[in-house]
A protein has these predicted regions:
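Bacterial N-terminal signal peptides that target proteins for export
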Residues: 1-10
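Solvent-exposed coil/turn segments that connect beta secondary-structure elements
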Residues: 88, 94-96, 108-110, 116-118, ...
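Periplasmic OmpA-like peptidoglycan-binding domain that tethers envelope proteins to the cell wall
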Residues: 150-231, 239
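Amphipathic, membrane-active segments
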Residues: 75-104
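Periplasmic peptidoglycan-binding/anchoring modules of Gram-negative envelope and division proteins
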Residues: 112-154, 179, 221, 233
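Extracytoplasmic
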Residues: 86, 98-102, 106-108, 130, ...
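C-terminal motif of bacterial Sec signal peptides marking the signal peptidase cleavage site
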Residues: 15-19
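Short, low-complexity, glycine-enriched hydrophobic/amphipathic alpha-helices that associate
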Residues: 21-84
Length: 239
């Protein structure tokens, strides 16, 4: 019975979101903030966080009102536009664990790093510097999570399990390199809530092709409303 209820709720919320394709975050923020509620937000947030051990954004345990959702949506619209101007960044609109709009920024690891390496290239530093200064520091009231991923290719003279662990370690080092560099550009450690390498987990493309493997070698940065931002939005004071 519990499983049936969860599936029904997820389906209902999916139908709500299917009507949002042409809306910006401001409109969707109001719809999700007012109608989705905490339960639906937990489901959608759980889907975003699948394989990460936790959903994006800490659940606040309460329904976020429509007006607050609209204000947060406006902020996310602005952050998404700022991020879209960064070379090498792919921007998507996603939903956090509170059912609120968030921003996902994906960087191709082939652009950031050399093969099998976790040292940032010069061009990567230039892009990340702009990302830090033009996006993260301009939205200091947003929390940030950073996740690193690899393809499923094995390592020379290693078993499948050894390769899997090496890929996890490499993705962790890459995510940490991005985090460390962003902080060197003035982003505070308090803003970056999580840094994790997930190796081969959650591929976004087919690992049987070279193009697919390149897509899977990536670093994802999530920007989502902090508890303080949600409080300000609820109070109507969020700028």
């Amino acid at each position: 019975m519990k499983k049936t209820k969860i599936m029904s709720l997820a389906l209902c919320f999916a139908l709500i979101l299917s009507g949002c394709a042409s809306m910006n975050n401001t409109t969707k923020g109001g719809l999700i903030g007012g109608g989705g509620g905490a339960a639906a937000g937990a489901i959608i947030g759980g889907l975003i966080g699948k394989g990460k051990g936790a959903a994006i954004g800490a659940g606040i345990g309460a329904v976020v009102g429509t007006g607050a959702g609209v204000l947060i949506g406006k902020k996310m619209d602005k952050a998404a536009a700022q991020a879209a101007a960064i070379e090498g960044a792919q921007v998507e609109q996603v939903t956090d664990n509170n059912g609120l709009q968030a921003v996902k920024v994906t960087f191709d690891s082939g652009i950031l790093f050399g093969t099998g390496a976790a040292t940032l290239s010069s061009s990567a530093k230039a892009s990340l510097s702009k990302f830090a200064n033009n996006v993260l520091k301009q939205n200091a009231d947003m929390d940030v999570d950073i996740y690193g991923y690899t393809d499923n290719q094995g390592w020379k003279n290693s078993t499948a399990e050894q390769s899997r662990q090496k890929n996890i370690n490499l993705s962790q080092e890459r995510a940490q390199s991005v985090s460390t560099y962003l902080m060197s550009c003035g982003v505070t450690s308090a803003q970056i809530k999580g840094v994790q390498g997930l190796g081969e987990e959650s591929p976004v493309a087919d690992n049987s092709t070279a193009a697919g493997r390149q897509e899977n070698r990536r670093v994802e940065v999530y920007l989502y409303a902090s508890p303080e931002m949600i409080q300000q939005a609820e109070a109507g004071t969020l700028q």
